């Protein structure tokens, strides 16, 4: 799909929908487009993935908040794979989607739902509930200057984290010993416990204590990782930061966190954006603000001054009689919206410099000018200044 659809549109829900309503909508879409029900249908498979991606974001309060504020740019993509931050192409396979589906609805995890669409019987809670371990998230900070924010930028991070064990390739087993079905849960990953109550016998399904929900146990543990399937290592990750990001915004890159045990689901890489202060410009959302200090003669007779922008200095014409407090607007010289909807402006706040000391000649000149009616504020000017002052308290 060339252009990403709105996640709410994908699941046919609204921004006011609850998590339960979103879960219900996802379940409906997953049943409709599940590969077992649509064998060989690539379009259905893509819609199945699309629905899973939408659910992954909208069911998570943090991801949903970022998406509501910044759209798809808030879940921005990783350089090189084109996948979405927090999406599936960055680190989740179809198996992972199936596993997530099983976790949500009590279905079977793995390469499918068990030899045909009937595997969806897990919805009732009676199916197997094999568990996949998810690795923990990693958090990093990235400091950006206004130039980088205005254009977007790629940043490389050298991450020290848990990766799949190089000796056992993440299985946790030594050599070809592999694993065997858990004798306690018979491979289901869960056990049923009976409890006598005043209402009779109550049955509850819980995670198997022997295999921790995996449905299998390792016969001969890897001598390098001790059967965990992970080891400490390094990875260099390139992150594409979209233009228009702001201080405090958190991006997430799916699948680039710590590896999950036994080839489980990797965690996410969370990137917290920090802004470097600019020596002359101040950010106000997508606008930039510059405080211009004019000399009195320039304000009175006009002229041209250089104004700093992100892309260098530009000359701006100053009209004769420019008053302190006037705001000049340079359209399109601000920052782009992270959603891609327009660009802010550069606002130039004008102040007039009054010298603190004067020579005798300068003082004499000003005393002569003071007698001119042009140097005496008119009633209309006084009223204008008073209205501006009063508006500060409204």
Swiss-Prot record:
Annotated coiled-coil segments of the chain: none
Amino-acid positions noted as binding Zn(2+) 2 in the UniProt annotation, renumbered to this chain: 182, 185, 208, 211
The protein's role, per its UniProt record: Participates actively in the response to hyperosmotic and heat shock by preventing the aggregation of stress-denatured proteins and by disaggregating proteins, also in an autonomous, DnaK-independent fashion. Unfolded proteins bind initially to DnaJ; upon interaction with the DnaJ-bound protein, DnaK hydrolyzes its bound ATP, resulting in the formation of a stable complex. GrpE releases ADP from DnaK; ATP binding to DnaK triggers the release of the substrate protein, thus completing the reaction cycle.
The entry's keywords: Chaperone, Cytoplasm, DNA replication, Metal-binding, Repeat, Stress response, Zinc, Zinc-finger
Residue intervals of every CR-type zinc finger in the record: 152-234
Domain J: 6-71
Cofactor(s), by name: Zn(2+)
Keyword Ligase recorded: no
Swiss-Prot/TrEMBL CXXCXGXG motif repeat ranges: 165-172, 182-189, 208-215, 222-229
Cofactor, how bound (note): Binds 2 Zn(2+) ions per monomer.
Compartments in which it is found: Cytoplasm
Subunit description: Homodimer.
PANTHER family: CHAPERONE PROTEIN DNAJ, DNAJ HOMOLOG 1, MITOCHONDRIAL-RELATED
InterPro entries linked: DnaJ, DnaJ_C, DnaJ_domain, DnaJ_domain_CS, HSP40/DnaJ_pept-bd, HSP_DnaJ_Cys-rich_dom, HSP_DnaJ_Cys-rich_dom_sf, J_dom_sf
GO BP: any one term: protein refolding
Domain writeup: The J domain is necessary and sufficient to stimulate DnaK ATPase activity. Zinc center 1 plays an important role in the autonomous, DnaK-independent chaperone activity of DnaJ. Zinc center 2 is essential for interaction with DnaK and for DnaJ activity.
Any one GO molecular function term: ATP binding
Chain residues that bind Zn(2+) 1: 165, 168, 222, 225
Name assigned to this protein: Chaperone protein DnaJ
CDD domains the UniProt entry points to: DnaJ, DnaJ_C
Gene Ontology CC: cytoplasm
Membership in a protein family: Belongs to the DnaJ family.
């Amino acid at each position: 799909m060339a252009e990403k659809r709105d996640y709410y549109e994908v699941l046919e829900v609204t921004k006011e929908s609850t998590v339960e309503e979103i879960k219900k909508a996802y379940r409906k879409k997953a049943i409709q487009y599940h590969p077992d029900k649509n064998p060989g249908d690539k379009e259905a498979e893509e819609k199945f993935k699309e629905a899973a991606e939408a659910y992954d974001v909208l069911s998570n309060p943090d991801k949903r908040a970022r998406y509501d504020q910044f759209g798809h740019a808030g879940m921005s993509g990783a350089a090189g794979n084109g996948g979405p931050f927090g999406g599936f192409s960055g680190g989740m396979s179809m198996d992972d989607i199936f596993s997530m589906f099983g976790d949500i609805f009590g279905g079977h995890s793995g390469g499918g739902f068990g030899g045909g669409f009937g595997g969806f019987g897990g919805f009732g809670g009676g199916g197997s509930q094999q568990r996949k371990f998810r690795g923990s998230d990693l958090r990093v900070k990235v400091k950006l200057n206004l130039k980088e924010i205005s254009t977007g930028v790629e940043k490389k991070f050298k991450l020290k984290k848990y990766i799949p064990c190089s000796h056992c390739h993440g299985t946790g087993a030594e050599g070809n010993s592999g694993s065997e079905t858990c004798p306690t849960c018979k491979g289901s990953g869960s056990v049923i416990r009976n409890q006598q109550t005043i209402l009779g016998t109550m049955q509850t399904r819980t995670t198997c204590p022997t295999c921790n929900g995996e449905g299998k146990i390792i016969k001969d543990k890897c001598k390098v990782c001790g059967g965990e399937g992970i080891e400490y290592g390094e990875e260099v990750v390139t992150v594409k930061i979209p233009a228009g990001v702001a201080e405090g915004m958190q991006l997430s890159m799916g699948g680039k966190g710590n590896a999950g045990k036994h080839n489980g689901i990797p965690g996410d890489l969370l990137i917290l954006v920090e802004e470097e202060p600019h020596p002359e410009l101040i950010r106000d959302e997508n606008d930039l603000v510059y405080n211009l200090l004019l000399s009195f003669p320039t304000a009175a007779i006009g002229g041209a001054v250089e104004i700093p922008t992100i892309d260098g200095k530009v000359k701006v014409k100053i009209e004769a009689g420019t008053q302190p407090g006037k705001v000049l607007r340079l359209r399109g010289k601000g920052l782009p919206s992270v959603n891609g909807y327009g660009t802010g402006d550069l606002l130039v706040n004008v102040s007039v410099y009054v010298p603190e000391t004067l020579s005798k000649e300068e003082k004499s000149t000003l005393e002569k000018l003071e007698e001119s009616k042009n140097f005496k504020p008119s009633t209309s000017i006084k009223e204008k200044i008073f209205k501006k002052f009063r508006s500060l308290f409204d």
